[in-house]
Design a protein with these regions (language model features):
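Aromatic (often tryptophan-rich) hydrophobic motifs at membrane interfaces
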Residues: 136-242
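Well-ordered, non-membrane alpha-helical segments in soluble/globular domains
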Residues: 26-34, 121-127, 182-188
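Short alpha-helical interface elements
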Residues: 105-108, 126-133, 181, 217-218, ...
Length: 251
């Protein structure tokens, strides 16, 4: 995911330009979109009117209120406490994380409901190179207190008043052995960014098409994340726009 020159809030991802400051994004004019697409890419994903009261077809999953642990569901509280007895949730440098993350990613990908191509060793190197290119990345890990094994991690992108939980993985066996690593990880990060750092909100991304990991419903149910609705306009490269109109004339 690379930044657009001169526009640090834009990132290029899978042939599309995406604005990372979702709460500050405005509706682009056709000329502005064309200017962005002159560089490269097939489309610009333009979201605007962030956190509108209208229930639109697109949203971001955010948490903007930090409640006491007693306000979370009883089962969630139990799992958080068990996770924190088993695991040390701590900050970790990107270089240290890179040395252990490949095994975690490979294990996590086996559990996805919708199978995508697995992350190869070359993809892995490229992935961490992209993270190094980004400013304000912070990494967290889930470390077993007994043997020191790192079973999960999160790579976050910290912005002026919010934080994106950008890339999160956990070993399949740790998820299914009743040690609840995700519960400890999300609880600790929420406490840090919303409580200690006083950010306005944390975000786990936008509407998922594949929902291969069920992470967004998990966060809504267990940690009181919510949908921040917004409006969406896709600006296409001119020739792709023609194709889209031919095949989907009423959209």
């Amino acid at each position: 995911m690379k930044a657009r020159k001169g526009q640090s809030s834009w990132r290029f991802y899978k042939n599309a330009w995406i604005f990372l400051e979702e709460s500050k994004e405005n509706l682009l004019s056709e000329e502005e979109a064309k200017s962005i697409l002159k560089e490269k890419g097939l489309m610009v994903r333009n979201t605007y009117d962030f956190d509108t009261k209208d229930n639109t077809s697109f949203w971001f999953i955010i948490k903007d209120k930090l409640e006491d642990i007693s306000e979370l569901p009883a089962s969630t509280r139990t799992k958080i406490r068990k996770a924190l007895k088993i695991y040390n949730i701590r900050r970790i440098e990107l270089d240290e994380l890179e040395s252990v993350a490949y095994e975690i990613i490979s294990s996590a990908e086996k559990t996805y409901k919708i199978k995508e191509s697995s992350t190869s060793s070359l993809d892995y190197v490229s992935l961490f190179e992209r993270f190094r290119e980004r400013d304000n990345c912070e990494c967290w890990c889930v470390e077993n207190k007994t043997n020191g094994e790192i079973v999960g991690f999160s790579i976050n992108y910290v912005k002026a008043d919010s934080c994106d939980y950008d890339y999160i993985k956990c070993k399949d066996e740790a998820i299914h052995n009743s040690s609840y690593p995700f519960y400890g990880l999300f609880y600790t990060m929420n406490q840090y960014y919303l409580g200690e750092k006083k950010l306005k909100y944390v975000c786990d991304g936008s509407r998922s098409v594949t929902e291969h990991s069920n992470i967004q419903p998990f966060l809504e149910h267990n940690f009181k994340f919510r949908k921040a609705y917004c409006k969406l306009k896709i600006h296409y490269k001119w020739w792709l726009g023609v194709v889209v109109k031919l095949f989907f004339p009423f959209r």
